[in-house]
A protein has these predicted regions:
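Alpha-helical membrane-targeting segments
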Residues: 1-16
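Conserved cytochrome P450 catalytic core segment spanning the I/J/K helices
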Residues: 13-86, 114-121, 125, 129, ...
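Central I-helix of cytochrome P450 enzymes
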Residues: 17, 21, 25, 55-108, ...
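Conserved cytochrome P450 K-helix E-x-x-R motif and the immediately C-terminal K′/meander segment
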Residues: 23, 97, 117-158, 178
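C-terminal helix/juxtamembrane-tail motif
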Residues: 51, 258-275
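Cytochrome P450 heme-binding "Cys pocket" and the immediately downstream C-terminal segment
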Residues: 97, 219-259
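Conserved cytochrome P450 K-helix/beta-meander segment immediately N-terminal to the heme-binding cysteine loop
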Residues: 151-153, 169-197
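Cytochrome P450 heme-thiolate "Cys pocket" and heme-binding signature region
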Residues: 195-226, 251-256
Length: 275
């Protein structure tokens, strides 16, 4: 109830957070409006949205608040799913130290003495990309993809599906299907080395971001974020479990929902490599 939120201070905190986000988005939009971006290479999503707004399209009318809402959706969705992927990824690497050693060796060989991993380094980190594919296969942040609706009557494998049927795609189950994957319950990034399988919507055995025109619009942002952060964690730190703790002690139970978190927090010791 609203009066309870007022008494507890929840309403005022939400309003303060909203105003803070609104100021950030105003600043972001002003920066894009005030600076000239004449070349296509330097245009980003905000530039495209502002161009649509300026063109005054009747098909896609956009207000400033609409653009802010789209930006918020991109960041909010990407932040939660990125954190989930990193949490599961670090857990699997702690449980599988040989995989971590190989991934660390690759990252440190490419990055060298630099303390910061650059986005330009990512294209050379092929084993790290395989690790991330394996993370998404076993632990898709969104276990059930957004619902779809059949446009017409169709028959698939003996099942008659009428038009207007709402259905869900279980990405979690597909990633563990023994008909598609050998040893599906094992964390083995090597399965993707030399393989053309990717998660960009062309291979239906691996669809953590969906497929088709309605696939996740933040796939590039999301994957780049996971790659960059995971590479930095592996490059900058050596990782180990606390004393008297073994990989078998880690609780791999999941909280099923719109996104799939681990029930237990991951507690590890980070040893910095750089002063």
């Amino acid at each position: 109830m609203e009066f309870i939120d007022s008494l507890t201070g929840t309403k005022s905190r939400l309003q303060k957070t909203f105003r803070r986000f609104d100021q950030i988005f105003d600043q972001l939009l002003d920066e894009h409006i005030n600076q000239k971006r004449e070349t296509k290479e330097h245009k980003d999503l905000v530039d495209v949205l502002l161009h649509i707004q300026e063109s005054g399209s009747d098909e896609i009318p956009l207000t400033k608040d609409n653009i802010k809402a789209i930006i918020l959706d991109m960041f909010a969705a990407g932040t939660d799913t990125t954190w989930i992927a990193l949490d599961w990824g670090m857990t699997e690497l702690i449980i599988n130290p040989k995989v971590m050693e190989r991934a660390q060796a690759e990252v440190r060989n490419i990055v060298g003495d630099r303390s910061v991993v650059l986005e330009s380094d990512l294209a050379q980190l092929q084993y790290l990309k395989a690790v991330i594919k394996e993370i998404f296969r076993l632990h898709p942040p969104n276990p059930l993809l957004l619902p779809r609706e059949s446009m017409e009557d169709v028959s698939i494998d003996g099942y008659d599906i009428p038009a207007k049927t709402r259905f869900f795609v279980n990405a979690w189950a597909i990633g563990r299907d023994p008909e598609s994957w050998e040893n599906p319950d094992l964390f083995e990034p090597e399965r993707f080395m030399g393989s053309t399988i990717d998660f960009k919507g062309q291979h239906f055995e691996l669809t953590p971001f969906g497929a088709g025109r309605r696939m996740c619009p933040a796939i590039i942002f999301g994957t780049a974020s996971v790659e960059l952060v995971l590479a930095q964690l592996l490059h900058s730190f050596d990782w180990e479990l606390p004393p008297n703790t073994t990989p078998k002690d880690l609780d791999m139970a999941e909280v099923f929902g719109i996104t799939m978190h681990r029930i237990a927090d991951l507690i590890v010791i980070a040893k910095p490599r750089f002063p």
